[in-house]
């Protein structure tokens, strides 16, 4: 998709970095571990929260709570803006104003709906768990009835989404190239450490392959 799906989804700052291809948007959302969802309360107060998300097709599911102000705002008709970012590198220029980051980000606009259908709720819960740790639902217990009643799941279509990506070296002006200052990129990536068993783990339970080999998609 060469054009922005809507005017408000169009990338304005550095438009050359804007990407509207649904596959590119999906790949970033699938790799990003968390997202931030912003909305405005009925009283006109801005809010933003970090949370987990999962994508199924062209629908983005976001985890929430039945006791949250988010749910009350959405039930009152609030629209949301959801953002996710992956940092790929620190870009060090020869002057501090020219420093930057290499990143991949997605912004989604939409009117969320509360998921109430039980089958869709189950599918979304499974997708959320698999988004964080692929393979986890093969052995971990899924939510019981009490836990489901405490949980809110919001669904937002990806009809109005855009990605923005920066890659490459610093962009120093010609007059700075003679400075005796190191310039370049420090690559950044998410790396899992050695798994730490729970202190109350029963003897004989070994960490599964999806724990020992954990990595983010694309990482």
Where are these regions (language model features)?
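C-terminal edge-of-domain segments
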Residues: 1-9, 116, 120-219
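An N-terminal domain-cap segment
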Residues: 5-61, 72
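A structural signal for short, well-ordered beta-strand segments
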Residues: 53, 110-112, 158
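Short, surface-exposed beta-strand-loop junctions and turns on beta-sheet-rich folds
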Residues: 54, 68-70, 169-172
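Structural motif
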Residues: 59, 79, 105, 111, ...
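Short, structured beta-strand-loop surface elements
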Residues: 66-127
């Amino acid at each position: 998709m060469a054009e922005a799906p809507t005017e408000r989804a169009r990338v304005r700052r550095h438009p050359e970095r804007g990407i509207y291809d649904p596959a590119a948007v999906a790949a970033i959302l699938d790799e990003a571990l968390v997202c931030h969802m912003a909305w405005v309360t009925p009283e006109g107060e801005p809010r933003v929260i970090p949370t987990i998300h999962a994508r199924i097709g062209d629908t983005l599911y976001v985890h929430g709570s039945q006791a949250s102000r988010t749910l009350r705002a959405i039930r009152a008709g609030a629209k949301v803006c959801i953002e996710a970012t992956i940092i790929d590198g620190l870009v060090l220029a020869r002057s501090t104003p020219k420093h930057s980051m290499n990143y991949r980000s997605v912004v989604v606009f939409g009117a969320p709906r509360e998921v109430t259908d039980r089958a869709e709720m189950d599918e979304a819960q499974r997708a959320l768990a698999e988004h964080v740790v692929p393979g986890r639902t093969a052995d971990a217990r899924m939510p019981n009835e009490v836990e489901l009643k405490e949980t809110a799941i919001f669904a937002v279509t990806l009809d109005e989404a855009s990605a923005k990506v920066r890659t490459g070296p610093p962009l120093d002006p010609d007059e700075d190239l003679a400075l005796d200052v190191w310039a370049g990129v420090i690559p950044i990536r998410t790396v899992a450490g050695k798994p730490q068993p729970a202190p109350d783990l029963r003897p004989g339970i070994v960490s599964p392959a999806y724990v020992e080999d954990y990595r983010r998609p694309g990482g």
